Amino acid sequence: MALVQSQKIVLVINSLQGGGAEKFVLTLGEAFHQMGFEVHIVRFDPIVEHTLSENLIYHLIPFRNYRRLPKGKIRHFFFARAVDGYINKHIGQPVAIFVNLYREHEVFYYSRQKKVAYVIHNQLSEKLKLATLPPKQLSYFQRIYTKYPAICVSGGVEQDFVRQFGEPTKTTTIYNPIDRDNIRVLAEAANPDLPAITRQGYLIHVGSFKAQKGHEILLQAYANSAQTLPLVLVGKGNLQAQIEQNIIALNLQDKVILTGFQKNPYPLLKHATGFVLSSHFEGFALVLAESLALGVPAISTDSPSGPSEILPPQNLVAVADIPALTEKINLLMSHPSQFNVPFNEAFLPLNVARQYLTFMGVDCE
């Protein structure tokens, strides 16, 4: 403990809104703190939707102050200089800086900080639509993503990264941390009020209302199912109005329940009969692993990365295969125990944190 007590680690994220990458940063930061490091969370947007631990040190460097500069490279160049200056003055020299998500990657491309690694949370070919971009823009991304080592949150994400950018930089796969003990404590909180139809059980999906998550596939598959249990959707996002319209069009108003975003979704998850993930693509599928931490049976679409590294083949269906997903939903409602999967302790935060430090050459003994 004393060996690393004065050593500093920085995790960079755009905001602390209620998403998986943001939760990842807080969980990993807490693990580094438990190992004796001084942990700094640097964000560019003031939004906070997660509960913040007092063990971590939080910094806000507002990106909005630079929006009056020309969009793109110039804006990111000058903002990167401001970030460098802030870190040097207010934090000092970290032993590692882990930079999450695309905007932050673009900013740090112009940074002069040392000991930086990108964390790649999604298949960039899908997230950035690389196949549709002109050569000049592709070249720009090539320069960004070959500047620093890259830590990918699943094997599928690493394969996609290497396929897109080659191997001029060091890469590895390290799964996301899942704080099983804390999740189980949080799951003991009072379950939010749900309609009476959920008393005999319900299926649940937790995720942002955006195209990646495939709500249209889930709703159609559920509409085609026996509907013996209601479906609870936890989340918010820019597709909420469209999802609500789909629910009406499929005549599911009495069967599908929208709870909105939940800062603590774990009581809802714990009491569910089963969890369903319907994504077109994922990085790691954090909530899938969280459902296993609570002993909740789970099924998922077999998106190119993430789910197949968490669930066995019998729990998976092809992406956008509505009949196959309907069949799995029916089985999940009638025989949920068929889809029980043990939690993988490789996901525990201290195990993950040690891998991060080893990758960066930081002594964590």
Show where each model-derived region lies.
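A conserved mid-protein helix/loop that constitutes part of the nucleotide-sugar donor-binding site
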Residues: 22-27, 201-224, 238-244
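Short His-centered aromatic/hydrophobic patch
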Residues: 98-105, 120
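N-terminal strand-loop element at the rim of the active site
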Residues: 6, 11-19, 23-27, 31-73, ...
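A charged, aromatic-enriched C-terminal amphipathic alpha-helix characteristic of glycosyltransferases
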Residues: 20, 334-365
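A short, active-site helix/loop in glycosyltransferases that binds the activated sugar's phosphate group
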Residues: 107-108, 147-173, 178-182
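Conserved acidic donor-binding segment of nucleotide-sugar-dependent glycosyltransferases
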Residues: 312-323, 330-336
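Aromatic "clamp/platform" in nucleotide-sugar-dependent glycosyltransferases that forms part
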Residues: 261, 280
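Membrane-proximal helix-turn-helix segments that form the acceptor-binding/catalytic region
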Residues: 85, 132-152
